Amino acid sequence: MKATDLRQQTTEELNGKVGSWKEELFNLRFQLATGQLENPARIREVRKSIARAKTVLRERELGINNA
């Protein structure tokens, strides 16, 4: 998900998405360890999505306005 899309969501929605992405990341890592992971690139995508969402949340916390 792009940062511009994330900036349009509320803080509660972002926190919910981060939680669900963390859960998905846990499951992906578990699948990787057991050899059942079909798409290893998904781990990277989820990690980056978490980072983007946390960045947007931190920007709001600091009052930074990035369009």
Curated annotation (Swiss-Prot):
Gene3D superfamilies found in the cross-reference section: 1.10.287.310
Any single biological process term in GO: translation
GO cellular component, one term: cytosolic large ribosomal subunit
UniProt keyword Transmembrane helix present: no
InterPro entries: Ribosomal_protein_uL29 (IPR050063), Ribosomal_uL29 (IPR001854), Ribosomal_uL29_CS (IPR018254), Ribosomal_uL29_sf (IPR036049)
Keywords, ordered alphabetically: Ribonucleoprotein, Ribosomal protein
MF GO annotations: structural constituent of ribosome
Annotated Pfam families: Ribosomal_L29 (PF00831)
SUPFAM superfamilies on file: Ribosomal protein L29 (L29p) (SSF46561)
HAMAP family assigned: Ribosomal_uL29
Membership in a protein family: Belongs to the universal ribosomal protein uL29 family.
Name of this protein: Large ribosomal subunit protein uL29
Species assigned in the record: Exiguobacterium sibiricum (strain DSM 17290 / CCUG 55495 / CIP 109462 / JCM 13490 / 255-15)
